[in-house]
């Protein structure tokens, strides 16, 4: 046992981290001599928005590697819609039944974060968005949070646990400013000692009026000023931003940007994106609503089945150049210009290919350009 309340990799990989009814199901099926060949599909019947971003495939493949199954899936970073299968598994049911809990956990959580990040990134209209929310979740999953946010399109992350290849971004906390006699001393110290490649973004709302501190920071050499209390201000945040921008411009600092953070939502970004140069987003990404995926049998011993409320039979998803999707039963010929989205990733337990985080992110960014 570790010192923290976390589940280790071995418990997940062995299938020990599961719901108890899967243990009982497997035991009783074994006693009855039943282990049918089935095909299951993972779909979401309800989404937080009109579309979702599929994420978490990397962990899902690592979980299923070595099991006697075939796994098909949409590429990570694919846009998907309600009722579309994102993963399909074929094999003897008892060989993978106990892995359902972890499998769904991997993709439900990661896809929820990636989806929220993609929506926020689309709302930002080309302005940088940084993930500041790993502190809003258990530290054991901070790497997953930052990876999922990156796949969703953010431009950097604050957590030092972010996977390699994700730029780290962060300015300074209020505590840093408060350790000095006055904000100016803090900003000058930061400028003296921070690495040269770290932008001189100065936090400007610790003690005084934002526009006063912003102007002082600009005079001290700030490349941008960061405002971090939009949700706690009793005044009109729009007015505050306009005043800061006005004072910077009229005093000869038009190139000093405004960085906004602090409880931001997608609606906030839509409201402020015309005047703000970059955003730091915490809980709206890290605490995103999970995608409510479910795993359902659609075929048993090559015969189509479904439970009530689900569509029976194996399905394929096709995508057109304009981004539209088409769902068809397997075996039905699609239109010539429709491209199949579901690919094979595991054959007889062997991984054929794994997601590339950078390609997954590029797939999202190319898809969301005109979505908001």
Listing of model-derived features with the role each one plays in the protein:
Residues 33-37, 64-67, 82, 124-127, ...:
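A generic structural signal for short, non-catalytic loop/turn and secondary-structure boundary residues
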Residues 1-94:
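Flexible, solvent-exposed loop/hinge segments and secondary-structure transition points
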Residues 1-22, 32-34, 49-51, 61, ...:
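Gly/Ser/Thr/Ala-enriched C-terminal appendages of enzymes
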Residues 27, 36-42, 128, 198-200, ...:
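Structural beta-strand/beta-sheet cores of well-ordered domains, especially the beta-sheet scaffolds
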Residues 48, 78-80, 87-253, 266-267, ...:
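Buried, small/hydrophobic-residue-enriched core segments of structured protein domains
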Residues 40, 69, 87, 130, ...:
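A broad, low-specificity signal marking well-ordered, structured residues that form hydrophobic/aromatic
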